[in-house]
Amino acid sequence: PSMTDQQAEARAFLSEEMIAEFKAAFDMFDADGGGDISTKELGTVMRMLGQNPTKEELDAIIEEVDEDGSGTIDFEEFLVMMVRQMKEDAKGKSEEELANCFRIFDKNADGFIDIEELGEILRATGEHVTEEEIEDLMKDSDKNNDGRIDFDEFLKMMEGVQ
């Protein structure tokens, strides 16, 4: 079956390891091996994977994901949904957490993140990034072109990432 744009995007957002982890959790509930799980089990699977949707969120998710109203979702639909939850969660991460993040990456505590520090951040996320990508992100994020990222620029950059 061909993937929708959303599904392709969801796959691109996740690392291979995450997809494998999600698949393992998904398969535990795919009792008959038919490649889909009951929407009833969705909450349980999501909680296993560290998500914590409320009943309302869950209903909204199911309504959105189970487009054909079959009462089941397949793995691709599941990925789309997990990515959406993760992005929501990330958005909900307060500035306070980002401030902590900033302090951790601002190794020399000068109130700025320089290109070295930025490279470390990106590599720490497990993303495979080239020097060129790091330079591009630095250029994009460093609005006042002083060669460093201050906290406000960092916040904007993180919004962009999510």
Swiss-Prot record:
Sequence positions that bind Ca(2+) 3: 106, 108, 110, 117
Coiled-coil intervals, chain numbering: none
SMART domains: EFh (SM00054)
Boundaries of every EF-hand domain copy: 17-52, 53-88, 93-128, 129-162
InterPro entries assigned to the protein according to its UniProt record, in alphabetical order: CALM/Myosin/TropC-like, EF-hand-dom_pair, EF_Hand_1_Ca_BS, EF_hand_dom
Gene Ontology annotations for the cellular component aspect, listed alphabetically: myosin II complex
Residues binding Ca(2+) 4: 142, 144, 146, 148, 153
Keywords from the UniProt entry: Calcium, Metal-binding, Muscle protein, Repeat
Disulfide bridge partners, by residue number: none
Keyword hit for Ligase: no
Residues annotated to bind Ca(2+) 1: 30, 32, 36, 41
Pfam families: EF-hand_7
Chain positions recorded as Ca(2+) 2 binding sites: 66, 68, 70, 72, 77
A GO MF label: calcium ion binding
Protein family according to the UniProt entry: Belongs to the troponin C family.
Role noted for this protein: Troponin is the central regulatory protein of striated muscle contraction. Tn consists of three components: Tn-I which is the inhibitor of actomyosin ATPase, Tn-T which contains the binding site for tropomyosin and Tn-C. The binding of calcium to Tn-C abolishes the inhibitory action of Tn on actin filaments.
Note: Skeletal muscle troponin C binds four calcium ions.
The protein's name in its UniProt record: Troponin C, skeletal muscle
